[in-house]
């Protein structure tokens, strides 16, 4: 059997041959060409159509890569309406078709063919080529990323080989494990194992005695022990969740109890009666009892409910909860930061006494500082008639005294008293009105100017005077920029006017507006002509060339506006003449 590719291409346009639209770039064209050329090359495929299609792909690529030919082809596509053509969806899908070779023997169907089973190496049949190659559907459905456990593999292999030797004994491993690896052992709400009829059949056939769950979990070779050990963590978590739910229910019942609560003796009697009712005699239901004993798990809870029942006033369920809360509180206090000094400290007798002592010391220090300052020679207070004077110091009444041992200043120097009088007093703003006069009165030593500086100053002043001369005003030159903002009247709509008289009136009104605008433009141009003749000597110099250019640009804009106005007048006259002749 040999496989042959059956190519299918959309040969409507060169773009559709390559599986592209007309908006495709050169890189996309090249990529699709390489892809199709690899698939349709005659050396690669044995199809009869591949050679013809390969030539078509090469021709399409040669045209679309040449810029001139591509432009012509795109123009032709727009004319034909194929510029937005999309390639067909069922094309560019290469299907493989099985081709029967001559002299081949008829083969069996897929259902009749022999499939090699997924077995270990030691269990596979001898010889090669016995079975058919595995297809994707016949492959193993075991997940690839599943973790491999060597012990479980050996245990499963041991029980399977034991089963084959006994010929008829039940496969224990297959009964205890589901197909997906999950255990058939299930937990009930009460924390006990659920039994099945399959388990009862196993124990009847094997004739084994009843063991507790502890014996199975301790035996590493037993399949039941492995199944239970695999789910110990899940069962413990389920048991913890059930205990938490029971604790919450008991707390709700405790807080919602009425005053008619039963005594502890009555509660113990009720508990004993409920336990007796829940127990079933082994004679009445022996099979259920044996099944529960076989799969009974040890209790994982270490909390006793009797302590909470005895002490209903305590918010904790038992002493272990209380111990946990106490240790958590102590740990939190241990790592707590120190109290902030900004926070208010509760007033006590000891703290008040300390603050009062500090306050008295500060007041005494302030009084001593004031006395020392009064005794100093540098500060002398003037005599005041009133004895009950305030402690506030007035700057105006103070006088500064020279210390002993200091030389007398010269008469030309400014004394401290004069300086004190000249300085601004307290709360007086410094006025800067007479600062210019004071600066002019100061005699500064000025260096005499050199000849070079005199020449530079003269040239600079001359240039400034020349600039002032060569900069006449815009009004003197006849430039009025406001005239450029004047709007030219628009051509009226004569199609809506049917009467000839009204048409004449509209034409006259338009002509009058245009004539007024022409008159203003001619006046401005006449002023410009006079200004050019007047300032001809000034404008022809080197400094005023740029100014002259701006004047000429203004004249040009005036003439452009005048030309537009005349063209509109010509259009109106043409329309009016046609209406009068009756052509329109």
From Swiss-Prot:
- The residue ranges of the J domain are 13-77
Q: Name one GO molecular function term.
A: Hsp70 protein binding
Any one of the GO BP annotations: cellular response to misfolded protein
The places in or outside the cell where this protein is found are: Cytoplasm; Nucleus
Q: Where is this region: Disordered?
A: 216-312
Q: What is its main location?
A: cytoplasm
- Compositional bias per record (Low complexity), positions renumbered to this chain: 241-253
Report biased composition (Polar residues) as residue ranges: 299-312
Composition bias, kind Basic and acidic residues: at what positions?
A: 269-282
Phosphoserine (modified residue): where? 229
Highest taxon, organism lineage: Eukaryota
Under InterPro entries, the record lists: DnaJ_domain (IPR001623), DnaJ_domain_CS (IPR018253), DnaJ_subfamily_B/C (IPR051100), J_dom_sf (IPR036869)
User: Can you supply one Gene Ontology CC term for this chain's record?
Assistant: endoplasmic reticulum membrane
What keywords tag this UniProt record? Chaperone, Cytoplasm, Nucleus, Phosphoprotein
The UniProt record's further free-text remark is: Present with 184 molecules/cell in log phase SD medium.
The name of this protein is J protein JJJ2
